[in-house]
């Protein structure tokens, strides 16, 4: 292009302050700065949005209505744009049908690969099934050794009762001479009488031959005749071979000659779990089914039936309705309504949950129910399968009587039929598990019966990317198959190699996208873009290094450089030092966050940045650094997970210290999230009566002697605090409740009879009804993006005139919501509760946020710190466990220091904190480190090292320790 730069003039979007700049094209450009300084606004809301908007505008009006419309950014001029592609973390698919394979489109090539190159095997007996033409069958027979004796036979009857005399008579009339009956050869004139009550097998002998030159014509006639009588099947009998090897069965159809199971011809649709042709009928291609989990229905086994042990009925009238029937059940099985569930016998528990049969016995197999319900492995033996089989068909017939108890779970299954509202209520008592038909493979048996060498498509998708590449490299095909295989193998290996290059070699293609971190999902899309081979595009990425161990960063940087060298502009929002230092151009925004940011502090090369006086430059040079704690806390006890086998974890016993800040580290795919999120968090959540999906597999969970058990568990992530502009920091932290109470107590409000609800913009009364309390009105533009205009009635203040007349200390409610946290704290200094909550927001570094700032404008880091502030506002936190997965995402080095102080403040209040993190500052600031590894995927799953950061550094087996050692050397040099 003629323009070597993307030229931006007077950008005022969000908090940007009329900035103008030139972003070099065809370079790797990194945008850095504090959280909320305007980085994402510049990269995504201006460069990407305008590039995408202009591309969409170039299409016809008809095409535009099917594409998402981007808002026009608030900027005076943008020139030099190219089509833009956004790779954000927030767009991780929650669709249960999206997998790594489908998103990267590798699965599409795999479906063709297995359809064209796969061989069918009988799902019942496992024998190969191959539809062959008559010519191919003749060629196979003539390939027998010269001089081989053989018979061409047509199978007529297989294991069918009857005398079959009519069939023998008809064959004699048609001129045939010999048959084989139940393995013995006879002429048609001396076939013995057959017992009509026994099953018989009959083969017609069409021809007897010796393999030699010149027999092809005769053989062709015999094969054609045998296939006609055998309805597409024939048997070649070799009498000179050993017993059991004499019969070779051929078929012109995809039918197992032994089991008579017919299989459809392989097609790409057969291997799609999103197609009715391929999806498992039971789970409709999801791979999982839901069932009612007894541990969620009755999480507190110390309660009795009449004290609310059964949560679905604890706060409703259902228990009173079922009380007579339950009392009668207790008389039959030795319990009363006052007996704690933990004192029930196994049979009584099974009857309570699954009902009784006609003889008063448990309707479901109760083996393992007590063990699992009391806190062991989550898998409920066959109970999930039992529910689906038994109750799906008869839920409508469930009846309650004193003579026979139908079971709590059948009654809840019946409730699932009462409509969507009931299903939502009952959802928290249900659990997901692998589909018992396809065992999580998502596909029909017919699709799984097709294999290439030793693997079907589901088995291939369960391999790690690294193993999948090795398997493909070992495949060799001949003849026609080689021509088909060559382009498919090339495309598959290329795309898998791209995934390996971005550090995702440990993932499997069957992994659900919903289970991936934002960083992993973004790198998957990055790998897809590498495979597309586009040039002249502007790629906009949001912290691609998130989720990557420092060991894997180099490969990621190589990938970004590869994109740039193809002739693309790569614009990266990033805080990682290595990525910043690898950039061609660095743009730093600041100086602060929110209203204190939005200015360009620096633009230039990395050497120029290192000489500049900016916040980022000071940290890169070592002039500023994050202080480390002077001493490490001692654990207040231990929580142990026994024999953890979740995902790639290898039966480990893992000890978590209580009352300290613990950092779980390790290379990508080593098992950190499997251990902390899927196992620790989910099992503790279930024990506390919370609903979670498919917790990891463990043998048990225990506490050390004297340790205080976890009584509350909180996962603090970076998801938004609200999905609409109505949500804001004031509403989330409950500050708004106090503010509304204060306004309701003013003389003006009391005189007018205004209650606190009058000062809410979410309900009628005080809000502006013209805009519904939004302050904006949406104008539909049909083929253009919707436009939001400030409400003419309230002028964007959300409230009606009468409400705004009420003032406190000279400000009305709208003006108070427009105050930054720092000013609001001084404004409400006479209200201790309010002042304390605002002080906590300041402590976590959010003093610049406006109280009423819409949640949709907050960054992930800001949202996370608001959540932490709400927890810090609680007076005491003993017995609470906080789990954070990569909390430094989106945070500048300066803000990481603030976050570390906040997490230590949680521990000082008596809480335990477990953090999954790669950031070396966070690791060095922890009391305890648990390092997973040694590699990723199948090479991980072990606890490599555990102890203080100093112990990890001293451990030669720890990859993390080596990076920590280098970091400590750098820190000492900076302090020098």
Language-model features: locations:
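Conserved phosphate-binding elements of NTP-dependent enzyme cores
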Residues: 1-976
